[in-house]
Amino acid sequence: MSATKIGYLIPLNNDFKEDTSLSNLPLSPGPNVIGRNNIPVSDKRLSRKHLTLTAAADGSANLLVEGTNPVVVKSGDQRKKLKSNEHVSIFDGDIIELIPGHHFFKYVISLSRKRPPCNGGTDNEEPSTKRMRKHAEPENGIGKGENCEEAIRGFRVSNDKFPLTFRLLRVQGLPGWANTSSVSIGDVIQGDVLVAILSNYMVDIDWLMPACPALAKVPHVLVIHGEGDGTLEHMKRRKCANWILHKPPLPISFGTHHSKAMLLVYPRGVRIIVHTANLIHVDWNNKSQGLWMQDFPWKDQNTPSTGCEFENDLVDYLSALKWPEFNANLPGLGNFKINPYFFKKFDYSSATVRLIASVPGYHTGPNLKKWGHMKLRTVLQECTFDKEFQKSPLIYQFSSLGSLDEKWMAELSSSMSSGFADDKTPLGLGEPLIIWPTVEDVRCSLEGYAGGSAIPSPQKNVEKGFLKKYWARWKASHTGRCRAMPHIKTFTRYNGQKLAWFLLTSSNLSKAAWGALQKNNSQLMIRSYELGVLFLPSMKRHGCSFSCTNNGVPSKDHRGSIKNPEVQKTNLVTLTWQDSHQNTDESSEVISLPVPYELPPQRYSSEDVPWSWDRRYTKKDVYGQVWPR
């Protein structure tokens, strides 16, 4: 074993107290074989290679049962029995029963690794020193003076503030602190849903129904999907009778319906959800993902109201999907035709984001600026940002890389760099970096090499020479997601821990998703459907405490437009931002976004290799597998 110790297996007696008559078993980074040869007990039920515990640098580990007898892992209140060749992630404090009910060992991370500092501070600092330094250092360090795991631990937002930010999806096997304020599909689809429209690329009905039993009670369900013929036939056989399946038209080759959203109609209003996960098990349990949602009330039908930007963008996008109109009798509300214009019946004046969508086609004239990166360019050009964001860097983070060239990268960065400083001067071009997992990140991930199947970019796209200057590491210690491979897609402009704007989207880095200008920039060609939400520094304090699912009666202020919105600037920041009171307006509202990765990101070293899913990897992963299997 390596001389570096990452932790120990500490023997326990039947009362789960430390058994001092037996020695602790040291663990090193990488595979540790545990069995009869190094466990100081005499029991023939223990194999010589009873289990392999593969420890990662962050202290988490994967346990693989190698012997013929089962092993039990107790994590919190959960007790899981594993048979031969089954595996599970374990964390600090978990208890392993080498034989069920016998030979207890606690997995303990060494103190030097338990609370790793984020590029600031040392392991042997006194807590009081760290607290003093926390208040003394500027906010644009990377969480300086604050432990990595404290960042997501402190992300607690009241219900009325949730639409101002987004949330990460819950990841199985992570310690509790890493899932603070995270959500599962059951947290989203709940209550008395009358109509559900589920928009996605991949849909596994066999997983979806047990994962979200509330769907079985919804009278009208429309699934807008991007599945192929084989899966579609299975979906038709397995779906409920009241479900409608629809695949939107794809007029240009190599396009997909890739948008991930939900529209849930309630007696009191509509819930709009935009997220990054396919409707499959691994996406909602094993990946780093993001989700935004907001509830909106029905409009007062007796009061004429004009649409807002959010409403117009939403209805324009829904109209492009061309789903078959259907009738729905909504109890207490009446009969309705469920088509895109039905969604004009809700009041979106409190929307906290702008929609950035893509639809396939050759877009010209007024439509040139309605979709893709030209829509983002247009919205940003209408915005004013703090002067500190002039020439500030850009981040492109996604999970699939298209076939790109330098000309198109310049076209995209021109859109991403749009906007003006508060003195009316342009922000200017920002230098982009691409956050992309390395081969080693995938190999050591929660899923091992299998996690790379959801990062489906071929070597010919990834290993283009001009991309080398863009590569940056996926590091997510402060959210506990270093080993939860990213399927989330985000684009942002930042300075330190402050964000000029932030886009959570289904769009990967590809011409198919964002569009490519043609014909002397007079036409934008897009192949795919995409949808994202753009967070901007707002000059209005939005009333967004309306809920479709709580039991209280919404106040009048929450049912319609805000008559006297308080003018107040909002500042967007990461979870590791520290308020030094030096660069922040006292009257401004600070909105924390759970950006899962570290900013600024660490550039690739000469040893780092970007992941390509069609290469062969012979170094075994955390489950002892090679790639492809």
Predicted regions and their residues:
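Flexible glycine-/small-residue-rich
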Residues: 65
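Short aromatic-glycine-enriched beta-strand elements
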Residues: 59-62
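PLD/PLD-like phosphodiesterase catalytic module centered on the HKD motif
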Residues: 2-50, 54-57, 74-92, 97-629
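Short, solvent-exposed loop/linker segments at beta-strand-coil boundaries, enriched for Pro/Gly
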Residues: 69-72
